[in-house]
Amino acid sequence: MATDDFFSLQREYWRQVAESDGFDIESVQIPPSMYGRINGLIPHNCEINTPLPYRVLGKHYAKLGLHRYNMLKGTKFEFGRLMKFNMLQNCVASFYITLEAYDYGVPGTSHPQTFQVRIDEKIFGSLDLTVSIARRTTDEVTTKKPFIHHYHGGAVADNIIFKGELPDWPSDDVLKDRERFYVIMNESEWRATAWISLYLELVLCAHDKFITNTDLSRLSIEKVAIETSIGDALLYERLEAKSANVYIWFKRLEKPRVPQQVFVTGMDVERKAIIRRVMDSTGYLTLVGKLCGGVTKVRQFN
């Protein structure tokens, strides 16, 4: 096949994908001779009860999309089930996810609603992603942006505290600054805020995309600190802040798997994670995070 013909078919493939913003590609047609040659999306049907790669990651990305929707709309949708997702064939991937969720914040509402969520990863092996779409399939799409199959941008912070590299872990003295930090010691407080556990699990999923639900279910959060730039604010205001650094102390992770890093092993080892959340006026939600305390591997050359 001539090079021009190949690129023409590649463009036609993405034109068809763009018609549904990447979510419904069952009707996308390509010539049989191009199977396995088109650099496109890999569909995953979660309705079929078979082993599925990235199922845990896809479920967490779906929950993050709902979290973004709830922050924007003031709703209380909760994850129901993962229906399907389409995934870009890259180490740094984009996910186009379809899921069902329930609005438990509205009395008498028991029927599921279908959502679409788009996640674009930015770095391999580390949490750095952006949620650019989180919507119900019944929502009216008022602005149709040009379709780009992998988005490299992110939400823009409005305060220097939340720009650039993630901060180092704060000292005990720094954490005493109540203008910047709110430390949550009470387990009932952070358990009532489901996104704190979600953020931690996303950090671990980003480092190890094949981590299991069993691994995640063992985690025990010990303490949480929320850093914001809104001064003397109430807890709920800090929890709902569009920009925040979240510091989490936790245990019950036997052996962290982080590219090019080595950690002390043991279920009772106290570990630390930092996650930054930024949501801007576009509605984009960007999360960046890392697991602290690792030692960089030294490469040896013979």
Swiss-Prot record:
UniProt cross-references to Pfam families, sorted A to Z: protein_MS5
Keywords: Acetylation
InterPro entries: MS5 (IPR006462)
Modified residues (N-acetylalanine): A2
PANTHER family: (RAPE) HYPOTHETICAL PROTEIN, CYSTATIN/MONELLIN SUPERFAMILY PROTEIN
Family from the record: Belongs to the UPF0725 (EMB2204) family.
Protein name, UniProt field: UPF0725 protein At1g23960
